[in-house]
Amino acid sequence: QQARKQTAKISKSQRAPKLKKLQAIVLCPTRELAIQVADEIRNLSRYMHGIKVLPIYGGQDIVKQIRSLKSGTQIVIGTPGRVMDHMRRKTMKLDFVHTVVLDEADEMLNMGFREDIEFVLSGVPEERQTVLFSATMPKPIMEITKKFQNNAKVIKVTKKELTVPNIEQYYYDVKPKKKEEVLSRLLDIYSPRLSVVFCNTKKQVDLLVNALLGRGYFAAGLHGDMKQEQRDRVMQGFRTGKTEILVATDVAARGIDVDEVEAVF
């Protein structure tokens, strides 16, 4: 569902599927989300002959990315830093770009991507559609909309319920020193097939993973300091069930889409 909303906004590329030039750019805060969005676009465009989609992000072989861009990629989904890198290298031609999507714009700003975003938006043709998705609309977001959007339409989506009815939720007031023990007991009591544990920092992720492994659990960590190969290996293990507990920072976990997750801590 997260990825489908972007796809609807870049449907303009349908009007020129035979044009082997870059026509749409989607900026995402994380590699995982970029990959997820790219996969969904591929699924929805598989019956449209000639549409070529490419996710680009740091930690991936840039030579392969350049080769793919030269081969006629029409839709790029990438992290701001890597897209900006290609623009500076002049390996990404922007003359035919007519759509730019900023996904999770507030999160990208929280991660320090404001200058990168403005660099990208300043480099694409002025005659374009710029679409911005954001859970919140703080002042920095409004400044970007005023600077790079003309007569923008604001669409607010609200829900009467913030939670899904069939998900049970519990709150435990636990002292910091007791969190590891309580988590272990909850894992033993409920025995979820797959579970995700969120931590605030990368250090906390590493410490908790080591503690869980020491207790005999099949756990693995995911955070921004890991190389892409490591992240891919961790996610593959989690999807196949080899890893039962994924410990991650909130940013690193964005874009994770695994149906069998039964518990989130």
Task: Describe the predicted segments one by one.
Residues Q1-F265:
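Conserved helicase RecA-like core
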